[in-house]
Amino acid sequence: MGSSSKSKNSGGDIIVQGSILAIAQIIVRLIGLFYRIPLQRIAGDVAMGYYGYAYDIYMLLLLVSSNGVPLAVSKLVSVTRAKKDYTNEHRIMFSSVLWTLVVGSVIGSVTFIFANQITRAVFGPEMMGVVPALRVLAPTVFLCCVMSTFRGYFQGIGTMMPTAISQIFEQIFNAVVSVGAAAILVSQGPAWAAMGGTLGTCIGALASTIFLLIIYMLYRPQFMKKVQKDRLHKPQSYKEIYKVLTLTMAPVVLSSVIYQISGIIDSSLYSNILTGLGYEPDLISSLYGIYSSKYKMLVNVPLAMATALGLAVVPGISTAMINGNREEIHEKIGTTVKFCMIIAIPAAVGLSVLGGPIMELLFNDSSALTRNLITIGTPYLLFYSLSTVTVGALQGIDKMKTPIVNAAIALGIHVVFIVILLQFCNMNIYAILYSNILFGFLMCLLNQLALKHYIGYEQEAQKTFVIPAAASAVMGVVTYFVYKGIYFVLHVNAVATLLSIVVAVCVYAVVLLKLHGLTEEELYAFPKGTMIIRYLRRFHLL
């Protein structure tokens, strides 16, 4: 009885901690969206193209240098903490900090010194406007490396709060400095405006690192007392610690690098092939700026919400795997995918219906290109949400290499497809859009086949896909006519768009509940679930 209770409490704690991080991620994405609006208007599409190119390289360097660190550190620290092995917990923390200081310094320095050569090799000599932005991002790699150790440590001792607060803190500084610096430097040209935008990323990382360092230093005296009293545990050698760190990080880094390198390959092929076809450099950069800073920023908000909710449940899959309970594993994966789709499907439909008006509202851009990108590109949101969750499920059942192999296969097909679309179909920025949709679809398909092969898992369809799709279809039709009606009467896009979004949320929720897409038991799992159920009963929706 006690064991069962403890297991439930542990599972509840995992969900609570995961939810804290999920909420922080949603807030961070929303801040990111809202500060990009003035940044885009101040800097312009060409500058945002340079910004997007520099950011692609920065993200790859960040993944190589620090992406696996939080997971590795949190995993090792949680094991030593469970054994009350404070001696080796301290040695793991020391080793991790030293690791990130060295790796971050080397990668940051190489990026700064060879920014010209990197830009020329990846994007071609016509895109040298990327260099100033890339140089500003070089020290950011170092800061994020160090930051990742502290985030991993706090997660390892069982609290997500420092990580969550630091992420929000980082994004606020990023927003303020990016917009301010771009406004000051835009008169010097697009390359300098892009550099101003990336300066915010650097200052945000610095602020977040200082915050985490202060929290750690406040906690350290209490922790060091435990280390000094620990006489039961023999210190591990640093060689052994680094070996375990490396083995833990490698699969995560490889999987993430394949995901991110697809973006670099896209931008590199796009830039070089279009240059060869005779496109002007400013047009190439401008189109990419619209794609990376308008379309992707907008899609990433619901994507963060869908994947964060799903990933908050994934740790439970690992627990069920350890217990050898296949039925529980199936239930955990099914619940994760279902909640992900309940958010991703209506978000995709909503963006396809209101994509143009939202783009006009946020970016004052009513062009056919931006409208088409968001309307046509919404399947990307569905496939990437689902593929992220299924990657987590495979990692949860200890099949760490499988997502890497699947991503490599999908990437190979993706590269062939984008070259054909760019070189022979002259589809410019649409080539990246369609290729990314294909990549996401292939990842979903391959991951699902792997789950069926390893644990005999097949996704339930009716409540996961059919009912949310039906509710979303009703929502889409109603929303379309509501927007058209309000705009016809008022001729104010902002009012029509915002009211239509409110109507869309209400219609979707009502139809989903009436079709029994969510059970009362599932609603209890939501934050404030009891209160939600009470109100739903009052309105006869349950």
Model-derived features: positions:
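N-terminal membrane topogenesis motif
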Residues: 1-31, 87, 91, 232-259, ...
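Helix-loop junctions and terminal segments of transmembrane helices
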Residues: 67-82, 303-324
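Interfacial segments at transmembrane-helix termini and the short loops linking adjacent helices
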Residues: 116-136, 334, 351-381
